[in-house]
Amino acid sequence: MYRTVLSVFYPMFFILVIPSLILLIFIILRYSPDCFQTFKYILLVTCISQIVAVTTNCLIQIRQVSNLTPMEIWCYGPLRHFTALIAYSTYFLTQTAVVISNVLIFLTIYLKYLATKINTRKTCNYGVTFFILSPIFIALGAQTSLILTEGIPSENQDHLEKINFDISDHAVIGYIRLKTLPSIIITFVITGTILILPAVGLLLRKKTLRNINSNKFSITKKALIKGFINGVTLQVFLPLICYIPVFGSFLVLAETKTEVPFEQYFFSVLVMLPMLFDPYIILYSVAPYRKQIEKWIKTKRRQSILIVDPAARIGF
């Protein structure tokens, strides 16, 4: 039953998310104001990382079989027809893209907070920015280590090739050993970004709103900043809501070696779920983008009226 549901879900999820991200990229490139250059590039990279995450997730469609020892990674997607190394590397690419997206969304909050401060020290800001980005490089290093030690060795590839003599349903692409150092690092990075960033983001939101109320910002400017910071804060909290329940279940089930098919099949689905809403949150919370959408809608309505009106007169 789970496989039947997911065989429909993954294509539908791809069709729903990717066009909205492409539309957002177009609007960012075409309609971002000059004062929005830094945020423009951050939003672009965030969108690209989400496209990569969604695409690779749909290609691998993994199931982490936590009741087996060692824990096996099963691939149900099209990449099961390729070598296990390609699918295993894609599995980590998906993780990296998710971490990049989460970290850059938080970085957007931090930079917006800095933009509302009167006095800022550039050297300190650069250091904090690098610290915020550091989880990306740490996770990438740990994932590269696992690919080099677990994926590339010929004996491991030969072993997986023997196991995967029949890939009509799925392929085993690798193993998860939670007690190895790289796996521990990856687990801490992912859970850290999910747990810590929302709390700090909420604090920065509070400070940003306090800054715009105390500093000499116009009413319009205050409304724009408030709408933007509220939207980005919501983005930071979405992974916490979607990810923590299933990840907590994963850790418990991995330790107890209990099989719960729902958790195994839908783990990667729930991790990606925030990306369904992210483009619409940005399009609504960033005033120039929202106004452009409203302009298109009004233009479309006028065109519809102009097309219908002559026919109505002819009928009269």
UniProtKB/Swiss-Prot annotation:
Protein localization: Membrane
Primary localization: membrane
InterPro entries in the record: 7TM_GPCR_serpentine_rcpt_Srd, Nematode_rcpt-like_delta
Keywords: Membrane, Transmembrane, Transmembrane helix
Pfam family, one: 7TM_GPCR_Srd
Family to which this protein belongs: Belongs to the nematode receptor-like protein srd family.
Protein name: Serpentine receptor class delta-45
Organism: Caenorhabditis elegans
